[in-house]
Amino acid sequence: MVIGSMLTATPLSAFMARQGRRAGFIIGTMGGAIGAAIGAYGLYTSSFLLFLIGALFSGIYMSAQGFYRFAAADTASDAFRPKAISWVMAGGLLSAVVGPQLVKLTAQSMVVPFLGTYLTVVALNFLGVFLFAGLKIPKPKPPAPGAAMGRSRMELIRTPRIAVSVIVATVSYALMNLVMTSSPLAVVGCWFETKDAANVV
C-alpha cells in the first residue's frame, strides 16, 4: 500500500493540477474500491499475490486522501482556511476511531475472515465516488504565458528547512507504519481476539 502511494502521489498531483481536485479524488476512491475488491478476492481464493496487488491499488486512495487538506486550503476563504484544514484533520482522527470499529463488526461476518471487512471498504469507496461527484471545486487556472515557474525539486531539497522536514516526515511515518502494522499482529499472536487488536493502536 505504501509503495502504491509512493508511485502514484506525483502523477496524481500532476493530474489534479490539470483536471482539478474532484477528478483526482474520484480516481483515488475508485483505486480504493478496486484495491479492496482485489484484496477480497485474494482472501477468498487464498492468493497472497492478489492480496498484495490489491494493497498496491489501495495505495492510490492512500495517496489521494493526502490532498484533502490542500483542497480545503484552495477553496476556503482566507478567514475560514485554518478552520477548513482543521476540519479535514479532525475527520482523519475520527476515521482512526471509526475504522477499527468497522473491523470489529465485519471481520468475522463471513466464512473467510476479513472478507466482510474488505467488501465494506469497497462499498465505502463507491459511496465516496458519489460524494466527490457532487463536490464543487473549481479547476485550477492554467499558468499565464511566460509566468515564473517554481523551484525545481533539487533546489527545494537543497533548502535546509525542507530537507529536515522531509527527513523528519519520512522517519516518523515509517515508525507509525511499523507500530500500526506490527502491534495488532502481536496482539493476535498473544491469543487475543481481533476485536481486542482493533483497539490497541
Residue ranges and their predicted role:
Residues 56, 158-179:
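Pair of pore-lining "gating" transmembrane helices in MFS-fold secondary transporters
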Residues 137-168:
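Juxtamembrane intracellular "pre-TM" segments in multi-pass secondary transporters
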Residues 181-196:
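Short amphipathic helix-loop junctions that connect adjacent transmembrane helices
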